[in-house]
Design a protein with these regions (language model features):
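C-terminal helix-rich "cap/oligomerization" subdomain common to oxidoreductases
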Residues: 95, 170-215
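Contiguous beta-strand/loop segments that form the cofactor/metal-binding neighborhood of enzyme cores
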Residues: 55-137, 165-178, 214-215
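Active-site loop of classical SDR/Rossmann-like NAD(P)-dependent oxidoreductases
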Residues: 156-169, 185
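NAD(P)-dependent dehydrogenases' Rossmann-like dinucleotide-binding region
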Residues: 9, 17-42, 53-59, 69-80, ...
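Adenylate-forming
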Residues: 13-17, 116-118
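A short, polar/proline- and glycine-enriched secondary-structure boundary/capping micro-motif
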Residues: 111-115, 140-151
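Short glycine-enriched, charge-decorated loop/helix-capping segments at active-site entrances
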Residues: 44-49
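Single conserved hydrophobic/aromatic residue that forms the stacking wall/gate
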Residues: 1-8, 12
Length: 215
């Protein structure tokens, strides 16, 4: 349940990126990074970067492609000396030529923040956007540079203010039948992402096990 509802925690990020993609004709390439401390591989036994961190970016890209199924899926995984997965790589492609790559790992050293770092970049036709969800400014470039949006406040008059406020108000509107359940937060969206994760995990196993066990 937690994983299926995890898209709600990134609602602000999805809204901002969806708005840019809609207004600019979609994206050509998306690349997503989520890196966490190396000790996560041992602190969370049985968890993998696919399911613990990459899942959030899969939800986000799912909303950008309007839930369309990818026609290409491939993945690779790396394992540490203890045999725990510490890096997951994934590639998804869609019929219109859109591509998305994902990197999620437990690789950052102790000197870095315990929260690690996240980054997402979207490239379209003559524009690009970069999102740092941790923290969360959004930067956009086209012919000009758009200054970062450093606060969780959208200037659109039809948009609620703040990530938590948006989630609560959206929930209230949905239960009162004032608006439909947002794409990316529905039960079927969670099932679709879980299906993608299953296919990515299988693809990574079929691609061979990369490790530094003999180093």
């Amino acid at each position: 349940t937690h994983r299926m509802s995890s898209a709600a925690s990134d609602v602000y990020k999805r809204q901002a990126l969806q708005s840019e993609c809609r207004s600019r004709g979609g994206f050509v390439y998306a690349t997503c990074y989520r890196m966490r401390p190396a000790k996560h591989a041992d602190d969370y036994p049985g968890e993998t970067p696919f399911h613990l961190t990459m899942v959030h970016d899969l939800y986000c890209v799912q909303s950008l492609v309007d839930g369309k199924e990818p026609t290409h899926i491939s993945a690779q995984a790396h394992y540490n000396q203890k045999g725990s997965m510490d890096l997951a790589l994934a590639q998804l492609g869609w019929p219109d030529g859109s591509l998305a790559t994902f990197s999620a790992g437990f690789l950052t050293p102790e000197a870095m923040s315990a929260e690690g770092f996240d980054r997402m970049e979207i490239f379209g036709k003559n524009w690009m956007a970069r999102m740092h969800p941790n923290p969360r400014p959004l930067e956009v470039w086209d012919e000009n540079y758009v200054p970062p949006m450093t606060l969780e406040i959208l200037t659109d008059s039809n948009t609620n203010t703040g990530m938590l406020a948006e989630e609560l108000r959206c929930f209230c509107k949905v239960v009162r039948d004032l608006e439909p359940i947002p794409k990316g937060t529905r039960y079927q969206d969670g099932i679709q992402v879980m299906r993608w994760l299953d296919r990515l995990t299988e693809a990574s196993e079929n691609s061979g096990k990369l490790s530094n066990q003999d180093d």
